Amino acid sequence: QDYKKAFEWYEKAANQGLIEAQNNLGNMYYFGQGVKQDYKKAKEYFGKACDGGNQIACINYKKLNPWGY
């Protein structure tokens, strides 16, 4: 699996407002797949996807709250 290439494509799609890509990018930041692990960035992208109606992203967003992100 080429996580770096996947990250590039998800980032392009997320920046164009694709909700699933925003959630996937959040996951990549959360797990450090293809990019340095960054919980703040993960929460940012989960928040965007949640605002777009992705319920899984909303759950992921809320999971980061107790950690102070």
Predicted regions and their residues:
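Hydrophobic face of amphipathic alpha-helices that form TPR/SEL1-like repeat modules
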Residues: N24-F31, N60-G68
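Glycine-centered coil turns and helix-coil junctions that link the paired helices
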Residues: G17, Y29-V35, G53, G68
